[in-house]
């Protein structure tokens, strides 16, 4: 969603700066502005015209398609991609003062901390090389400041034994051992770790177009402006950069700037800010005036839903869903079958509505080979878009996987206890996708006492993100010959998947009061005499006490 936002790195320096300097030496820039991509071809486009307001009864699937067709024109010459915009200008004739002023103002909205944007000033056209160079090395300092959040410590005031046990298991979010770091470092000797691929750039631009169309269709006049949508993508990239910084790898690796976290997860701005706080990035960036993109305090309960019912779906009535016009009839059947499998195995019901009001799931097709599906984790405001490519096989299973994300379920292989069950071959991972293998922050997700399952529909396959596709990146530590083929299955919900959903949604009043309850339950604390009373009172779901 989030997506724009080329937070540019050394590859831009290598490719753009010589080109710009040559333009200056010749007294003009080469080429013409017509090289800009006015609209990604990878997304389904609807007919011309915006259509009406979905709240007025217009089919939401039609509306999103109509808006998507116009987003490119509304954005102008790649206006959402500031650096790409500069690149296009550098190849054409010198723009008029009015045209350059418009682009310079847009740049300063995106990067309010840039030295050329201070005290009401704007960069000049001759500043283009300096602008690019500054962003390459200091983008995080130029974006709106990361807000400092009041994050509750779930271990505060607890029994020393419970605290000590969690700390003995807890690996610091994003941390690597020296051996693991060296293995990744060695990979970069033969892998272009400091260059952004064109595929990432294209995927991000396509996703931005789709997300802008969705926000406009669902939010109407209340939809966030382009800069606000762009900031989600900037924050996502900042999280990936911060993870590499924590692992002491940021000086050699440029994370994939594709707008996506962990291959198929979209981060809201609040979720990204939470992760940045956990990674020590709170307060980084520039102050912006009223209406700026990054301010405001967000309470802990507003980010993910383990400690708050706010982000959970109300399942006392069916969850509304709608199907975009981009979907073929066979695609719609796969989605309906996926929702049916969830419903027959749990208490969660779904109801189709062509003109949904309020929170709902919105399924859309994206003609992309870069991902199978994308979704937010947990319920989002005003609705949850779920993007599916239908190009990976097991379409019904992929739809279930992404719907599970929307219901609030994280990936199996990022659990706190992951390293007890699988071994990551750090020497074979794509270093630019390090976020795919970094164990989740322990404060965010709970297992609800369900055991690690190799066959979970929420597990990735053994070869995901591999440099050498013939070698696995994830190797089961228990019976690898039998369990390796199970990783990444999308045929059905497993017993563990169903049990987790039931604990999350199907036991009214049976809640955990601490995000670590699932971990304690799996290690027998529900039945230990010294901890039994506290566990049974505070970890009812994980201890199966209701």
Curated annotation (Swiss-Prot):
<feature type="signal peptide">
    <location>
        <begin position="1"/>
        <end position="14"/>
    </location>
</feature>
<keyword id="KW-0645">Protease</keyword>
<feature type="domain" description="Peptidase M12A">
    <location>
        <begin position="308"/>
        <end position="507"/>
    </location>
</feature>
<feature type="binding site">
    <location>
        <position position="411"/>
    </location>
    <ligand>
        <name>Zn(2+)</name>
    </ligand>
</feature>
<keyword id="KW-0325">Glycoprotein</keyword>
<keyword id="KW-0865">Zymogen</keyword>
<feature type="disulfide bond">
    <location>
        <begin position="347"/>
        <end position="506"/>
    </location>
</feature>
<keyword id="KW-0862">Zinc</keyword>
<dbReference type="InterPro" id="IPR017368">
    <property type="entry name" value="Peptidase_M12A_astacin-9/10/11"/>
</dbReference>
<dbReference type="Pfam" id="PF01400">
    <property type="entry name" value="Astacin"/>
</dbReference>
<dbReference type="Pfam" id="PF01549">
    <property type="entry name" value="ShK"/>
</dbReference>
<dbReference type="GO" id="GO:0005576">
    <property type="term" value="C:extracellular region"/>
</dbReference>
<keyword id="KW-1015">Disulfide bond</keyword>
<protein>
    <recommendedName>
        <fullName>Zinc metalloproteinase nas-9</fullName>
        <ecNumber>3.4.24.-</ecNumber>
    </recommendedName>
</protein>
<feature type="glycosylation site" description="N-linked (GlcNAc...) asparagine">
    <location>
        <position position="248"/>
    </location>
</feature>
<feature type="propeptide">
    <location>
        <begin position="15"/>
        <end position="300"/>
    </location>
</feature>
<feature type="disulfide bond">
    <location>
        <begin position="372"/>
        <end position="392"/>
    </location>
</feature>
<keyword id="KW-0378">Hydrolase</keyword>
<keyword id="KW-0732">Signal</keyword>
<dbReference type="GO" id="GO:0006508">
    <property type="term" value="P:proteolysis"/>
</dbReference>
<feature type="disulfide bond">
    <location>
        <begin position="526"/>
        <end position="543"/>
    </location>
</feature>
<feature type="binding site">
    <location>
        <position position="405"/>
    </location>
    <ligand>
        <name>Zn(2+)</name>
    </ligand>
</feature>
<dbReference type="InterPro" id="IPR034035">
    <property type="entry name" value="Astacin-like_dom"/>
</dbReference>
<feature type="disulfide bond">
    <location>
        <begin position="510"/>
        <end position="546"/>
    </location>
</feature>
<dbReference type="InterPro" id="IPR003582">
    <property type="entry name" value="ShKT_dom"/>
</dbReference>
<feature type="active site">
    <location>
        <position position="402"/>
    </location>
</feature>
<feature type="disulfide bond">
    <location>
        <begin position="517"/>
        <end position="539"/>
    </location>
</feature>
<dbReference type="GO" id="GO:0008270">
    <property type="term" value="F:zinc ion binding"/>
</dbReference>
<keyword id="KW-0482">Metalloprotease</keyword>
<feature type="binding site">
    <location>
        <position position="401"/>
    </location>
    <ligand>
        <name>Zn(2+)</name>
    </ligand>
</feature>
<dbReference type="InterPro" id="IPR001506">
    <property type="entry name" value="Peptidase_M12A"/>
</dbReference>
<feature type="domain" description="ShKT">
    <location>
        <begin position="510"/>
        <end position="546"/>
    </location>
</feature>
<dbReference type="InterPro" id="IPR024079">
    <property type="entry name" value="MetalloPept_cat_dom_sf"/>
</dbReference>
<keyword id="KW-0964">Secreted</keyword>
<comment type="function">
    <text>Metalloprotease.</text>
</comment>
<dbReference type="InterPro" id="IPR006026">
    <property type="entry name" value="Peptidase_Metallo"/>
</dbReference>
<dbReference type="GO" id="GO:0004222">
    <property type="term" value="F:metalloendopeptidase activity"/>
</dbReference>
<keyword id="KW-0479">Metal-binding</keyword>
């Amino acid at each position: 969603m989030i997506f724009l936002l080329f937070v540019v790195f050394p590859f831009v320096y290598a490719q753009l700066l010589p080109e710009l300097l040559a333009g200056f030496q010749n007294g003009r820039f080469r080429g013409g502005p017509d090289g800009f991509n006015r609209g990604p071809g990878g997304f389904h486009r609807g007919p011309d015209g915006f259509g009406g307001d979905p709240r007025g009864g217009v089919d939401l699937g039609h509306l999103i398609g109509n808006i998507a067709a116009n987003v490119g024109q509304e954005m102008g010459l790649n206006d959402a991609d500031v650096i790409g915009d500069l690149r296009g200008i550098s190849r054409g004739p010198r723009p008029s003062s009015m045209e350059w002023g418009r682009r310079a103002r847009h740049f300063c909205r995106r990067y309010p901390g840039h030295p050329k944007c201070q005290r009401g000033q704007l960069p000049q056209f001759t500043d283009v090389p300096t602008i690019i160079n500054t962003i390459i090395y200091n983008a995080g300092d130029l974006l709106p400041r990361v807000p400092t959040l009041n994050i509750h410590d779930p271990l505060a005031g607890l029994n020393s034994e419970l605290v000590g046990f969690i700390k003995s298991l807890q690996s610091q979010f994003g941390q690597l051992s020296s051996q693991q770091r060296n293995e990744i470092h060695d990979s970069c000797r033969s892998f272009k770790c400091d260059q952004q691929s064109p595929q990432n750039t294209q995927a991000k631009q396509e996703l931005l177009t789709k997300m802008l169309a969705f926000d406009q269709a669902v939010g109407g006049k209340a939809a966030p402006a382009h800069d606000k949508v762009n900031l989600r993508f900037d924050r996502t990239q900042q999280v990936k950069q911060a993870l590499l910084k924590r692992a002491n790898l940021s000086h050699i690796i440029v994370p994939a700037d594709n707008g996506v976290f962990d291959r198929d997860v979209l981060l809201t701005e609040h979720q990204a800010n939470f992760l940045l706080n956990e990674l020590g990035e709170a307060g980084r960036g520039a102050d912006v005036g009223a209406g700026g993109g990054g301010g405001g305090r967000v309470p802990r309960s507003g980010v993910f839903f383990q400690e708050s019912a706010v982000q959970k779906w109300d399942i006392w009535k069916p969850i509304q869903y709608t199907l975009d016009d981009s979907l073929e009839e066979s695609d719609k059947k796969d989605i309906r079958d996926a929702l049916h499998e969830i419903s027959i195995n749990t208490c969660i019901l779904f109801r189709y509505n062509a003109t949904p009001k309020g929170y709902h799931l919105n399924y859309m097709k994206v003609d992309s080979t870069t991902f199978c599906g994308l979704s937010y984790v947990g319920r989002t405001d005003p609705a949850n878009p779920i993007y599916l490519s239908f190009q990976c096989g097991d379409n019904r299973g992929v739809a279930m996987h992404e719907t599970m994300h929307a219901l609030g379920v994280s990936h199996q292989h990022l659990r706190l206890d992951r390293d007890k069950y699988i071994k990551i071959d750090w020497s074979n991972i794509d270093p630019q996708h390090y976020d795919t293998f970094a164990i989740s922050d322990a404060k965010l997700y709970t297992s609800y006492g369900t055991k690690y399952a190799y066959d979970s529909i929420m597990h990735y396959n053994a070869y995901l993100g591999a440099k050498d596709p013939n070698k696995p990146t994830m190797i089961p530590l228990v019976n690898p010959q039998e369990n390796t083929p199970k990783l990444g299955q999308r045929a059905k919900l497993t017993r563990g998947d169903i049990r987790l959903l039931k604990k999350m949604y199907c036991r009214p009043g049976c809640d955990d009061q601490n995000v670590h309850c699932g971990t304690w339950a799996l290690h027998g604390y529900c039945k230990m005499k010294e901890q039994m009373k506290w566990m049974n009172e505070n970890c009812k779901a994980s201890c199966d006490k209701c």
